[in-house]
Amino acid sequence: MDEKEFKRLLRVRARLKRKKPRFLRQEWWRYPKFKNDPKWRRPKGIDSKMRLKLKGKPRSPSIGWSSPKLVRGLHPSGYEEVLVHNVKELEALDPKRQAARIAHTVGKKKRIEIIKRAEELGIKVLNPRV
């Protein structure tokens, strides 16, 4: 796949994501335990209007909402995210298609070393704050 097609697929994914609704579980607004964690759960009740996909009821996830397969799971910049804990893990990355995300357990001193080495290797760091 060439670079032009890859960029086009990233734009298509961004457009699809803008239109995609938040898929929340049935009656998430009704119970406090669902409000705090309103992740998707498939409606299974025999009288469930949402399961029957009736008009006016919240949407359900289906295959049509997915993004193009070649760019699925990538960072919005187009890089594959790789979690890095030290400089050795950083050196195993491919700068053309992978970007580093420094783990939250890494301290300030080691974080500075990783950022410095990433600049030398030409690797993009997604969270470079010091």
Swiss-Prot record:
SUPFAM superfamilies: Ribosomal protein L32e. PANTHER family: 60S RIBOSOMAL PROTEIN L32 AND DNA-DIRECTED RNA POLYMERASE II, SUBUNIT N (PTHR23413), RIBOSOMAL PROTEIN L32 (PTHR23413:SF1). It comes from Pyrococcus furiosus (strain ATCC 43587 / DSM 3638 / JCM 8422 / Vc1). It holds the Pfam family Ribosomal_L32e. GO terms for molecular function: structural constituent of ribosome. Coiled coil: none annotated. Signal peptide: none annotated. Part of the 50S ribosomal subunit. One of its GO terms (cellular component) is cytosolic large ribosomal subunit. It comes from the Archaea. Belongs to the eukaryotic ribosomal protein eL32 family. PROSITE patterns: RIBOSOMAL_L32E. GO terms for biological process: translation. Keywords: Ribonucleoprotein, Ribosomal protein. This is Large ribosomal subunit protein eL32. InterPro entries: Ribosomal_eL32, Ribosomal_eL32_arc, Ribosomal_eL32_CS, Ribosomal_eL32_sf. The gene is rpl32e.
